[in-house]
Amino acid sequence: MRAAGCGGTGVAALTTKLSRSISQHQPKSMPQASVNSEQNPSVPNSPSAHKPARSQSAQSAPSRAKWFVRFFRSVFGYRKTSLTFLVALVFAATLLLSWADSSLDFSVDMPTSKHEQAVLSRSWESLQKIARTKHTYTSEGNDEVHAYLEAHIASLVAKKPYMELDTDKNGTRRVMFDVKYLSYDSVSYYESNNLVVRVNGSDSSLPALLVSAHYDSVPTSYGVTDDGMGVASMLGLLEHYSSVAQPKRTIIFNFNNNEEFGLYGAQAFLAHPWFSQIAYFLNLEGTGAGGKAILFRGTDYGIVRHFSSVRFPFASSLFQQGFNNRLIHSETDYSVYIKAGLRGLDLAFYKPRDIYHTTRDSIQNTNIKSLWHMLSSSLDFVEHVSSQTIDLDEEVHAEAGKRDLALYTSFWNHFVVFSVSQVVSANIALLVVVPVASLLLLFIIFRCNKGWGFNFVNAIKYPLSLVASVLVLTFVSQVIIVPSNPFLVNSSIGLLVATLFSLFLLLNYIVLNGLNLVFKSFKGHQHDEKLIVMCESSFLTWILLLWSTVKLSHNKFGDDHTGELFIPILFSLQAVACFLGFLGWCFKPSKKVKVSREEHQPLLSSNGSNYGTQDDDDSLAPSSSLSLQSGFSENCEVHETKSFSYDWLVQFLVIVPISSLIIFNSGSLILNGLNKSIQESLSAQNLIYKFIQIFVIVWSIPFLPFIFKLNRIIVLALSLVLLYGFFAVNITDAFNDANPLKLRFLETISMDTSPPTNLVTVSARSMDVVKDILEDMPSLKDSKTELSIDSLGDGMSLYSYETPLIPHLVPGVKNLTDYLSIDVLKDSSSVSDSPFGLLTGELKINVPRNRNCKIDFNMSNTVIKVSDTKFMESKRSPVRTVIVYNEDKYENKSSSVIGAGVPEGFSRDSKGNSVFKDMDGISQLQLNKLNWDKPYHIGFQWVPEIVESESVWSEKIRTKKLGVNIECYWGDLDQLAEKDKAGNPVVQDRVPAFEELLHYSPSYVSWANRDRGMVSVTKYIEV
């Protein structure tokens, strides 16, 4: 029996055989046989006519067979109802699985062993004590945390003879180094008080493993996530190793200080004598507030693959790519260790950034399960590396440039990692094999005349739809959404993604089906259009894969592509689905001569070959290479069989579920890590909206081959989401209690005026709401002070006003002028050097109860003379050498110390003074000391006018004067207890202006520090 149509293929052969088998075993009805016998005497009567009547059960067998086939086809055929059900199921599964993967409740189990429970309990108790008060480096709370840690660590170390503690007491370990990262470009002097613990291993020949975290916080934060969690995890590790057998490998713990404003503690540790033992490291950090700890970065594939030993791995090299390409504007101690040649990992909390560095980074906004996730990951990794010899031990001294970077990801506690070379090799294979195999199959299809009516109209529909939809999506995003509510992503990133995703799918649905209506009379215009869309999507992914492969093969810092592991996976899924379609056409019988309709008969029913409901929504698709109705018109050639195929189902299951999950999971991970950075700059805002558009487009592509058959229910649902989204965009608050507006505060007292000015500055995005909040402060309204707004560029503004609220930073200090005084011990007029020689300056800076000052050397006085006699401002500082004296000596023969014999970089003179020389110029000197009351005593040498190579340096006006600006910071926010004149105790806020802002700001505002402290005092002098 032959059937009319163009739709059968080889993939559906089993279905065809099933239909034939049922047809062959189906009994003929008695009346029909009699009629045939009577009408055609030449045909003998059917034997069945002489057989006794069948039983009722035998007669119902055909009905049961027909019912089974109908059910099978109605469920698995290419019908709108079936497709709609699967699409809805994929959406639900994607959202649910992605949420569960990032959820602590569903992906992390609490410890079950008594030992781990005890370790976690003590670690949580330690975290509570660390976070009892704010403890920035410039606060007394920092000393309290240091004292607690030292006592607790000492008690643990005492339990084992092979454990030892080293403390940098009283600033005995003094270092100087240049700090050049992010916005920092300075030379720093630092007195370390790190707490360093060594757990000596049984095999001293093995290189040591470093575990590092910092115990300081920013002035406005309790430092729970940043970085109390890391410190508590390290205490948990020490607790563990103080109660188990000696590890094979030595483990060194660096509890370092003052990370927040220059990574000082980690940098100082490089000078520690134990550092030379170390080859590997694990850095514990927090750039968010709670949640799950994610593997941010890894130095290379060799060390990253050992992260598979972790029981609850949570990782994505997308963050590594973001860090390496400077999309994330923060740094961790990881960067110090990697520059020192170590190999290791950066494990950190990553969201949300609007709570990060604010008072909301507290115990109440985290939980013990977050701590357990970081602690368990640290415990597993450290135990794995320290308990055995690993393969990396043989290549400890391998050059960093020769190490292969890693691409990695995780899902539901399964960790996957590949090296760059492995991915590049696999990508090249895919780039070559897939096109060759596809062309071979296409050659067979067209060479053997399989009847695929591919033409220009088929090819152009999808690109037209894609381009038109992208243009409309961009217009809606940039012209409608951004102007109406630009900061919406801060609070409602899901709403925005859902709205734009619905819009993009609907646009493609309308355009593609609209083109089908326009070309309805065109022969073959719908011939297997889903396969054509798959092929074109596969081609686009192939181009993306080619670009990614080229970039990966030349991967470098600043142009990193190690987060693109998903690209070859998505391309492979697209390619497999296309192969299925091509194979179906290859096994399809060749075209035959058209025969009359009367020669054909339905397989199972005289009513037609289309089973199931005849409603348009549930009709079997006529647009599949393997569909039940692949003929488009009566002019279509006839084939040997008509197969009721289900290739669409296989293709759907190959492409859509996995692709949707990978794309959504990766995209949501990035957005959750970046969306709060919209408050940090206009460029960050543009980046986020651009990424949302890319995310929506990429997430839609797996669904587009099947967009033609979307049920009206899905279309209605998408329309409702779109309408609600457009409505909600205009009424949803960008900032609320859960997603606060983040403002940054600094109060600056300038000694350059008389009386001193007391100025509050607040930095934030340029928006009216900030102005309204500040102008509503009682002190502004009472003093009738005018708010000044200055642009900082990149969408940021500086809001400033003079405040009558005087800070109380130090007990006993009543006058603002007592906070900073400068003694000039030596200036340019005190030496007889020629204008072309080095001039020397020496200062004593007196500041009570202070730990941090910054000195900027004025570059505006220095010009460079070029050959065309024009003058231009030099960006180089005239200062070449700085010295920090250990003792408070006012008469120091610095000229004999600072001379031509001083080496570049950091050195110490014969008296132990710290010297740093940089012939490129020193524009800023950061001073960090541990003694609260000791003055700063510094010296420096500069070049007022000198010939170096082709450049001539000279002063603009004051040939022998150097501008020096001193700014000192206080960061303590605890209340100050004093006694009044009558001897009664009086408690005062240290920074009343900040407390006023905290008290009167709306609940949707969170406050952070602008700089190294909450209050700074400045003074400008010339020497």
From Swiss-Prot:
Summary of the function given for this chain in its UniProt record: May be involved in vacuolar sorting and osmoregulation.
Source organism: Clavispora lusitaniae (strain ATCC 42720) (Yeast)
Family of the protein in this entry: Belongs to the peptidase M28 family.
GO molecular function terms attached to this record: metal ion binding; metalloexopeptidase activity
Protein name as annotated: Vacuolar membrane protease
Transmembrane segments: 81-101, 426-446, 462-482, 492-512, 530-550, 565-585, 644-664, 688-708, 713-733
Top-level taxon of origin: Eukaryota
InterPro entries, sorted: Fxna-like_M28_dom, M28_fam, Peptidase_M28, PFF1_C, PFF1_TM
Residues of the active site: E259
Residue intervals on the Cytoplasmic side: 1-80, 447-461, 513-529, 586-643, 709-712
Sugar attachment sites: N170, N200, N490, N675, N815, N858, N892
EC number, as in UniProt: 3.4.-.-
Topology in membrane: Multi-pass membrane protein
Broad class of enzyme this protein falls into: hydrolase
Cofactor(s) required for function per UniProt: Zn(2+)
A Pfam family matched in the record: Peptidase_M28
One GO term (biological process): proteolysis
Binding-site list for Zn(2+) 2: D226, E260, H357
Ligand binding (Zn(2+) 1): H214, D226, E285
Keyword Acyltransferase among record annotations: no
Cofactor-binding details, from the entry: Binds 2 Zn(2+) ions per subunit.
GO CC entries: vacuolar membrane
Biased composition annotated in UniProt, kind: Polar residues: 17-48, 604-613
Localisation: Vacuole membrane
Vacuolar side: 102-425, 483-491, 551-564, 665-687, 734-1023
